[in-house]
């Protein structure tokens, strides 16, 4: 199994396949950013907490890593009915990232390789491998694509735009083109990150502490 990408989805896919006995190759454009929490250091939350719990129930690593690196745990939406309650944990970003990388590195059936996948290798409507931007080919019976925001990634800062998967990293434009050539239709979703506040510009004495929950 080849897994393209090493974010939340890529890690869970790689570990699940490896723990089921498959030989897994995880390909990441930068092996030092495996499990990186790019913007919000939260696991769970509204419309996401149930998914994090389902992953945990199926033996995933996300919940365990959150327990080990969490800073604050809360149940959101408790003013409403139990059907819309949502668990959320705020994590130590670097501790979460480093622990996830450590977990992946020690998994027996999982090999980690650095490289940007630029092309799907396929014939007769069947994928049989990938090719990197350096021209290296890897072959497998199954290819799982977990590229997150990197496919044709476009970043907006104010009125300015630039191509990129996230700050400081290039977009995966080659793989996007390869998917289109294979007959797959690509769409675009957009997410926004609010401006951060300068701590010394805030009068902290006027704020109310919001503690976590047991």
Predicted stretch roles:
Residues 15-119, 134, 146-166, 170-175, ...:
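Conserved N-terminal/central alpha/beta ligand/cofactor-binding core
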Residues 133-142:
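Core beta-strand elements of the Rossmann-like FAD/NAD(P) dinucleotide-binding domain
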Residues 110, 127, 140-141:
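Local beta-strand N-terminus motif with an aromatic residue
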Residues 1-9:
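Beta1/beta-strand and adjacent pyrophosphate-binding region of the FAD-binding site
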């Amino acid at each position: 199994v080849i897994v393209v990408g090493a974010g939340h989805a890529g890690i869970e896919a790689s570990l699940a396949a490896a723990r089921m006995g498959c030989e897994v190759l995880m390909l990441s454009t930068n092996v030092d950013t495996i499990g990186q929490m790019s913007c919000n250091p939260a696991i769970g939350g509204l419309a996401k907490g149930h998914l994090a719990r389902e992953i945990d129930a199926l033996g995933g690593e996300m919940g365990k890593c959150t327990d080990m690196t969490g800073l604050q745990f809360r149940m959101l939406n408790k003013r409403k009915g139990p059907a819309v309650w949502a668990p959320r944990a705020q994590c130590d970003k670097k501790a979460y990232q480093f622990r996830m990388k450590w977990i992946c590195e020690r998994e027996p059936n999982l090999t980690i390789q650095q490289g940007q996948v630029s092309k799907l290798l396929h014939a007769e409507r069947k994928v049989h491998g990938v090719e990197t931007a350096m021209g290296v080919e890897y072959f497998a019976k199954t290819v799982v694509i977990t590229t997150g925001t990197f496919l044709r990634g476009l970043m907006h800062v104010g009125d300015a735009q630039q191509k990129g998967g996230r700050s400081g990293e290039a977009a995966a434009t080659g793989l996007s083109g390869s998917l289109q050539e294979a007959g797959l239709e690509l769409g675009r979703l957009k997410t926004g990150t609010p401006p951060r506040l300068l701590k010394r510009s805030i009068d902290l004495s006027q704020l109310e502490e919001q503690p976590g929950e047991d």
